[in-house]
Amino acid sequence: ILFFVLIPLVLTFTLWLPHTATPGTGASTGTWFHWVKVYSALIGCVGFMLIRYNKEWSSNKYALLFPPIILSVNILEACIRDFQVYGLHATGQVIDGVVMMSGPWNIMNGIAGILNILAISGWMGIFISKDENQDMLWPDMLWYWIIAYDIWNFAYVYNCVSDHAFYAGAALLVSCTIPAFFIRKGAWLQHRAHTLALWMMFTMSVPAFVNSPRWGVPASHNPQALFAVSFVALLANIMVITYHIWKIFKFKRNPLKKEVNIDEPAYMDVAREKNCFD
């Protein structure tokens, strides 16, 4: 509550609006995307806490729709921004405080993000761990979807805020993907929401950090690199959605009613914990 409700409310009116993220001033943190992103991430954190610590919510099939909906909204926000940047027809100008390069990579990556949304499944199988952490675990969200998401998200940051790609892209993604693979399998979305919300709060409070000579990691803004990264993102998500659709039809699993990946070892590794307590 302190980190994801009280502090953001105080920062909104004492720092962000009047000083560091004022809309319409040309600041990189003053765009619609940054404001929507920080609050959608915070809403995700609060919603996940309600599911984790309220038994009625964690067992309510309608409440379990919240995680895929807020995840889809977050992805869609970035897709819209990618398409918007394409429409700017930028060729290296500073727009909204960052260097912009528009091109087909924006369209490719926007499509990749939409495919990533379509491959989300199995939210009805979300459950809360019985240990003291009470983690929100999603067995059907497997490693290959997470990798496809990471590639897409890095491509988005590289396309739309290139000079922030090291921190907001690579470092931020690794911070939740490594735990999901090696520490707490199944809890990726919970970790993603927390790390994203904290990063957005930090960057809106100290926007100069990523552009400072000491800490900044500037991008090359090379059109070939932009194209290559978005091409890989699109290819990865085409592969994931193709496999997803194949499984749906082969095993006759309606993704709106049941989990799709119940035969996967990675699914079983997470679901086994639920079965131990059922």
Q: Model-derived features: where do they sit?
A:
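Central hydrophobic cores of alpha-helical transmembrane segments
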Residues: 3-8, 64-70, 192-204
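An N-terminal, globular interaction/scaffold subdomain
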Residues: 1-60
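Generic multipass alpha-helical transmembrane bundles of integral membrane proteins
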Residues: 59-187
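Juxtamembrane "helix-exit" motif on the non-cytosolic side of transmembrane helices
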Residues: 14-24, 79-87, 152-162, 208-217
